[in-house]
């Protein structure tokens, strides 16, 4: 049986009231400075020429603002915004219905674009390149090909698994944008802004404490902020301070690095059962009773970013920092130092 959805997961959850906290413009958007500066140029250039902006691909870990940036692009271009996701577009007719209902220069956002049906993807190619749909009408000897012209539009794709995109699809995006984990300083700004929108009093130390445990991810920061607010309100605390945030997050089993019970189970399994590794991801997924995708997309990226774990050709290994976080010594003969640049 799998555990309930952990508080730290960067995946969007149905109950997340993210909409009210989302920035409405590039000026309000915190972090991703290089991507933001480049997007501002592309938006202004498209607007000044009266053209649709080039097709754009956002890739990177979940929860970093891909959907929000897509909405901001549409808003700053002054055009319509349609959103869907790869798994929802089951057949070519679904895609045709979306594309033929677009107004000139509209933005079509496809989340999880790496999960598009291959048949649908083939139909998308001429739509992106030639602004046309090539559809087969009828069956058997009576079947005929029909080309439907489309208005100029901007396709924005988002993926957490860029490597799963086919080369023909990836190459059709003129603007590839990688989104990276946020710094603590950037997340502190996200928390402070979110608290202000909630009408929650928070001091700098309290915001910093939440930011420090947010896994470099704004979506996680927003979720932790809402849970800290719950504790603060019940305790009748006028202002969220560092001790209040620390006490709330400790009760939620989110440690000083932002790791929770799932992360610690992952690290402990590698340490205790496999003596620090290497161990394959399929073995870890089976031992944790979690899908492989959850391990690779949710658990591992931040642990690797922190230098706690190394992903090698032979499997996953604990680094020295991983052993230190578990407050243990690596066993004699372990391969720990090989992946830290230490002997």
UniProtKB/Swiss-Prot annotation:
Region (Small ATPAse domain (RuvB-S)): 183-253
Region (Head domain (RuvB-H)): 256-343
GO molecular function: ATP binding; ATP hydrolysis activity; four-way junction DNA binding; four-way junction helicase activity
EC category: hydrolase
Keyword Ubl conjugation: no
Positions that bind Mg(2+): 67
UniProt: DNA binding residues: 292, 311, 316
Region Large ATPase domain (RuvB-L): start-end pairs: 1-182
PANTHER family assigned: HOLLIDAY JUNCTION BRANCH MIGRATION COMPLEX SUBUNIT RUVB, PTHR42848
Protein name: Holliday junction branch migration complex subunit RuvB
Gene source species: Erythrobacter litoralis (strain HTCC2594)
């Amino acid at each position: 049986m799998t555990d309930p959805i952990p508080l730290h997961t960067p995946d969007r959850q149905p109950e997340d009231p993210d909409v009210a906290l989302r920035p409405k413009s590039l000026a309000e958007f915190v972090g991703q400075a290089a991507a933001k500066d480049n997007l501002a140029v592309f938006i202004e250039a498209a607007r000044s020429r009266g053209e649709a902006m080039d097709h754009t691909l956002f890739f990177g870990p979940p929860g970093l603002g891909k959907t929000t940036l897509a909405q901001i692009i549409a808003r700053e271009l002054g055009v319509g915004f349609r959103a869907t996701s790869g798994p929802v577009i089951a057949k070519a007719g679904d895609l045709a219905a979306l594309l033929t209902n677009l107004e000139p220069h509209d933005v079509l956002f496809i989340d999880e674009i790496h999960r598009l049906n291959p048949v649908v993807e083939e139909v998308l190619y001429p739509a992106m390149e030639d602004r046309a749909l090539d559809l087969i009408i009828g069956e058997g000897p009576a079947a005929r090909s029909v080309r439907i012209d489309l208005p100029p539009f901007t396709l924005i794709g988002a993926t957490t698994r860029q490597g799963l995109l086919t080369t023909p699809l990836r190459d059709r995006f003129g603007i590839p944008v990688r989104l990276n984990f946020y710094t603590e300083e950037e997340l502190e700004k996200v928390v402070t802004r979110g608290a202000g929108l909630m009408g929650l009093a928070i001091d700098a130390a309290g915001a910093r404490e939440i930011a420090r445990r947010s896994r470099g991810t704004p979506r996680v920061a927003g979720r932790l902020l809402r849970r800290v607010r719950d504790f603060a309100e019940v305790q009748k605390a006028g202002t969220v301070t560092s001790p209040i945030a620390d006490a709330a997050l400790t009760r939620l089993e989110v440690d000083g690095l932002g790791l929770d019970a799932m992360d610690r189970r992952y690290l402990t399994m590698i340490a205790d059962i496999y003596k620090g590794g290497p161990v394959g991801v399929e073995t870890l997924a089976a031992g944790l009773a979690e899908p492989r995708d959850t391990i690779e997309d949710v658990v591992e990226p931040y642990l690797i970013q922190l230098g706690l774990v190394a992903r090698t050709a032979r499997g996953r290994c604990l680094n020295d920092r991983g052993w230190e976080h578990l407050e243990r010594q690596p066993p004699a003969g372990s391969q720990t130092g090989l992946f830290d640049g230490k002997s």
